[in-house]
Structures are given as C-alpha cells and as structure tokens.
Amino acid sequence: MSTAAVQDARKQAEALDNEDSIAFVRDEFNIPTKAQIASSRLADSHPAALPASEDDAKCIYLCGNSLGVQPKRTVTRLNQYLTTWATQGVQGHFKPLEESPLPTWLDADAKAAELIAPVVGANVSEVAVMQTLTANIHLLMSAFYRPDINGRHKIILENKAFPSDHFAVETQIRHHSLSTEKSMVLIESSSKDNIISTEEVLSVISAHADTTALLLLPGIQYYTGQLLDIPAITAFAHKHGIFVIWDLAHAVGNVPLYLHDWGVDAAAWCSYKYLNGGPGCIGGLFVHTNNSVVTKEITDEKPEEGYNNRLAGWWGNDKKTRFVMANKFHPVAGAAGFQLSNPSILDITSLSASLEIFQEAGGMEALRSKSLKLTSFLEATLGHMKEEDRAHFRIITPSKSEERGAQLSLMLSDGLLDTVMKELEARGVIVDERKPNVIRVAPAPLYNTFKDCVLFVEAFSAALEVAKQHAL
C-alpha cells in the first residue's frame, strides 16, 4: 500500500472503531501478545490484561474461524467448577451452592442449551450441548438415514466437503451394506473458485429427487467462506421429501441462524471456532420439534414405540426415571433425548463462559451488523493494495455480503504460501492456511477491530513482497 493509502485506511479504521457500539467486549478476551506467539516457552502464569496504551503489543489474531481466542472469564468459571468438585465431590451433581453462578452438574447441559438456543434460532427444547461435531452427525444420520435400496437410499453432499463429513457419509452408507458408487451423490461446482450456486444444488436435488433420502451440506463452506442459502435449499429439498442436515461448524456464532423458522430438520456444530469454547470443546446439535416429539406415553411393554428411534444412552432418558436404573429407555422429548453419556462439565463450563459474552454483546444480530462492516472494510482495504501485489492473489469468497460470513479466503499465486505465512507470523499476525495456496482471514466481531484489518493488510503487503523475491 502507498503511504497515503495506509494513512487513509488507518483514519477510517480509527473512526469506525470509535463508532463501534460493542467494542467493549474485546476486553473480555485474552488476545495473545506478539511476544507470546513468538515464544516457545509456556508462560509462567495466565496472561494479564494489557493497559490500553499497550494494545499495539497484542498480535493481530484473525483466526477465529479455526480457533477462537480465550475469554478472560473462562479461567474464573473453570476455577469455580474445580472448587465445586474439590469441596463437594459427587454432591456437585445435585447441590446448588450460594454465590455460585454455575448450575448443578445435573442441569449444566440444560442451562447451556438455553444459552445456545438464541445463537442458532431454535427453541430450547430443540438443541442439545453434547458430543463433538462428527459424532453428532453420525448420531443424526443413525436416527434419520433409513435407506431403501429400492427407493430412497442416496445421500447428497458437496464434492469439496470437509473430509470428516465425507468420511461420515461414506461410512454410514457402508454401514447399511450399500455402496458409495450408487448411494453417494456429489455436488460439483462449475466455478474456478469452488463456489456452489444455489441453482447447482437445486439441480442435483432435482436430478436425484426420487432416490435421495438425505442431504448434508455446510451452512458456510470451510474453504471458500461461502454462506449457502439454508432456507431456500431446505425448503426445496422438503418439497421432494428429502431430510436435510446442516453442518454449521463455520456458521454458528458467525451469522444469525433461524433453524426453527427455516424448518431445518437437523443440524450439528462444534464450539471452538466463533463460539470460543476452547480446543476440541463440546459440540451441539439441533433437531426440529417435528422430528423429536414423543408422540405418546411410552410403555414398558412397547418401549420402542412413541418416538423416533435413535442410538440411545442414559443421559437422553427422562430425568424422572434416569436414576431408577430400570434399563427401559424413556427419552426426553426434544433434542435432549438424543444425548448419550453425561457430558463433560469442564467443556460445558468453558463454552458457557463465552456464551455469556454473546448475550452481553446483544446477540447475533448485533454481532452480524459489526461483522458485515468488518469484512467489507477488510475487502476494501485489500483492494487498495498496490496493483503489482494484487496481481498475486484473488479473493475467492463471494463478494456479496449476504453470501458470506466473517471469512475472506485469499488464493495466492503458486509458490508463495509458505513464505507469506512465515512472514506474517514474524510480524505478529495469526491467520489460517489451507494448502496449497489459500489464506483464510476471519475478523471476529467479538474481539477484532477495524484497526486489525488495516494492520493485517500492511503485514500481508510486506509478506507478499518478500515472497515474490524468494520466488524469483
């Protein structure tokens, strides 16, 4: 960028940051310093808050699409949980403690469901905090994928699906003694940037409508950052009698979702990206009310009737009879009836600490409002780079704001990625790479600033210059 362009971008960023009505929540997070990310030693103690004058010492962290940063209150909440365990032992399951903000362990998952429901646009009864993403996808498919080789047996997914989704589909098909050659349909993109148009999705559905049992798609595509038209695709699939599951790993906490109103059948997500739950933290699933009702009183004589069959565990059993130990499964109505084992309270406590901040920030609509501005500003600032630098990358994420979340994916010219990533890290910038040529940059509205976007573009410009010289 030219000196004038840099100065202008910094002035714009300062003005936008001053206007940011949710800027206060940035202080709720531990953003690593440049010194910390450069160090190979474990810090002696938990990172302390930096004085405002030292904000420049923080790294430029634009990697919330891979792993969100740590909320400061996570340590407080985890210590409260550990203190409960240390001082109460097994009583922590049932005994509420005065002056503790934490629910009893028996109720921890239900409280977390209350916190996550507005994030995904669901009734509380339609969500469960449980397991991990791929495990939940398997659980949903085990309940709702009932193939008939003489009728509906196919599963449709995108050809560039995240590998774990692909593996789940393949193994579910084989589990039913079917072949992927006959029962798996891949949606191919005609775009050089792997963008899947809604028309392409609908065309594939139409072509296989009578033989398709299930559709599995990402709410936001992990590689390109494309936001798919969830309500339109869901409605079209339903017209053809197809059950729809959405993988919301990159959508939850990123864009507003209205799963109940959209009539989504089921969905699953992780919690360590935009939800900031921590590495490998507990996942979640959504099952629409229409698919999770207990239609009549379950009797001991016919315990398999009255609800949709699923792989079951005792934590999905009605709380009234859960501890009777009668070995007769009476599921909770709603998504909670799909739970298996008692969940990790450590995980739920960590996730809930972050979800508290979502509430304080005003919910997903407020975050989306800022996110739209952040990502558009980042895109515009990249457009002000020198022409000779812009010739070495292109943005493959859709340019329309309604077709993307926070992430911009930058496709670099061949041979530049490794050097660019090394140079960015040396300049205190953390982003995500996807071989062979893509950098994924995701300003998260909870803790990123417009200034972060400018500083990234400055560092990216310098990194490109070095990479081009190395490539000669």
UniProtKB/Swiss-Prot annotation:
**List of residues that carry N6-(pyridoxal phosphate)lysine:** K273
**Which pathway does the database say it acts in?**
Amino-acid degradation; L-kynurenine degradation; L-alanine and anthranilate from L-kynurenine: step 1/1; Cofactor biosynthesis; NAD(+) biosynthesis; quinolinate from L-kynurenine: step 2/3
> Could you give the subunit structure recorded for this chain?
Homodimer.
Q: InterPro entries given for it?
A: Aminotrans_V_dom, Kynureninase, PyrdxlP-dep_Trfase, PyrdxlP-dep_Trfase_major, PyrdxlP-dep_Trfase_small
Q: Which HAMAP family match?
A: Kynureninase
Q: Which family does it belong to?
A: Belongs to the kynureninase family.
Q: Quick one: which gene encodes this? A: kyn-2
Q: What is this protein called?
A: Kynureninase 2
Predominant place of localization: cytoplasm
Highest taxon above the source species? Eukaryota
**Where, in this chain's numbering, is pyridoxal 5'-phosphate bound?**
L133, T134, F162, P163, S164, D165, D247, H250, Y272, W314, N342
Q: State the protein's purpose.
A: Catalyzes the cleavage of L-kynurenine (L-Kyn) and L-3-hydroxykynurenine (L-3OHKyn) into anthranilic acid (AA) and 3-hydroxyanthranilic acid (3-OHAA), respectively.
Query: Where does it sit, as one GO cellular component term?
Result: cytoplasm
Q: Which UniProt keywords apply?
A: Cytoplasm, Hydrolase, Pyridine nucleotide biosynthesis, Pyridoxal phosphate
Query: Where are the coiled-coil regions?
Result: none
Name its co-factor(s): pyridoxal 5'-phosphate
- Cite a single GO BP annotation: L-tryptophan catabolic process to kynurenine
What is the catalytic activity of this protein? L-kynurenine + H2O = anthranilate + L-alanine + H(+); 3-hydroxy-L-kynurenine + H2O = 3-hydroxyanthranilate + L-alanine + H(+)
What EC number(s) does the entry state? 3.7.1.3
Q: Record's Pfam families?
A: Aminotran_5 (PF00266), KYNU_C (PF22580)
> Where in or outside the cell is it found?
Cytoplasm
GO MF term list: kynureninase activity; pyridoxal phosphate binding
